[in-house]
Design a protein with these regions (language model features):
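C-terminal peripheral helix-coil segments that are non-catalytic and often amphipathic
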Residues: 1-29, 136, 140, 172, ...
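Basic, helix-initiating cap at the start of DNA-binding domains
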Residues: 1-56, 60-69, 86
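Hydrophobic alpha-helical connector segments
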Residues: 90, 104-143, 193, 197-200, ...
Length: 242
């Protein structure tokens, strides 16, 4: 156990008495009620983390604050999350899944509205709309959103697999859009659709990362991502014959 975890668990043990009612209730409850209790505690922890992250940077939040905000003791908190970093995953993971669901549903509706293959620019616009949505999500809380995104690159992060899976999900959707355009003869087929999709995702991650290091205003994130996506996508468009 590293020093950070030791410190977290030391504080948790100091607050063990606060969590006893919750623990006792779960131990004596029927399986169905026990599962309901666990889900309710998880919901309260998630809500507390989301609320606190909306108020201040992740680095300034303590596990004691989260536990108090959720109405539980720290010992109970650490029965649901193994480290402070997992609170970031808990707070952002479901929200990111919901965002991707929303963006995919919007793309499905747009596809149904067209009813047939569109021009090359239409496929490119569909790709851009996904990253415009990601940029809007980032702007809700740039510092904490960037931390969540970086979990995918941290080999020690408990949230790494989920963050990577969400990125892969978006990459696959973009790949399928580009492949549709190629099959329709609207986009150049000699370019590998998966490579382009990975490049598009890399553009977004790079712009998030270099926002603080280059001193860029977070509000310019979509302007920067949009310009680079255009440079990647526009050359693929096959102009229809006159």
């Amino acid at each position: 156990m590293n020093d950070n975890h030791s410190w977290f668990f030391t504080e948790a043990l100091m607050n063990e008495e606060v969590s006893q009612p919750v623990v006792a209730a779960e131990a004596s409850a029927p399986l169905g009620l026990r599962e309901q209790s666990k889900r309710e505690v998880t919901r309260r922890i998630r809500a507390a983390a989301v609320d606190l992250l909306a108020r201040k940077p992740f680095s300034e939040i303590t596990t004691r604050e989260v536990a108090q905000h959720a109405g539980i003791g720290e010992a109970t908190l650490f029965r649901y999350v193994g480290s402070k970093d997992e609170l970031l995953t808990l707070a952002y993971g479901d929200r990111m899944d919901a965002l991707l669901d929303e963006l995919q549903s919007a793309d499905d509706l747009a596809t149904e509205a067209v009813g047939a293959e569109g021009a090359g620019e239409w496929y490119c616009a569909r790709v851009r709309s996904f990253y415009e949505g990601r940029a809007a999500f980032y702007l809700q809380d740039p510092a904490n959103a960037a931390l969540y995104l970086r979990q995918g690159f941290d080999m020690t992060s408990a949230g790494r697999a989920r963050t990577i899976a969400q990125g892969d999900r978006l990459i696959e959707r973009v790949r399928s859009i580009l492949a549709e355009g190629q099959a329709a003869g609207a986009l150049l087929s000699r370019v590998d659709a998966l490579s382009v999709a990975q490049n598009c995702h890399g553009i977004f991650i790079h712009e998030v990362d270099r926002t603080p290091t280059r001193g860029f205003e977070p509000s310019t994130i979509w302007q920067r991502v949009h310009a680079r996506l255009n440079a990647q996508l526009d050359p693929l468009v096959i102009e229809p014959p006159l």
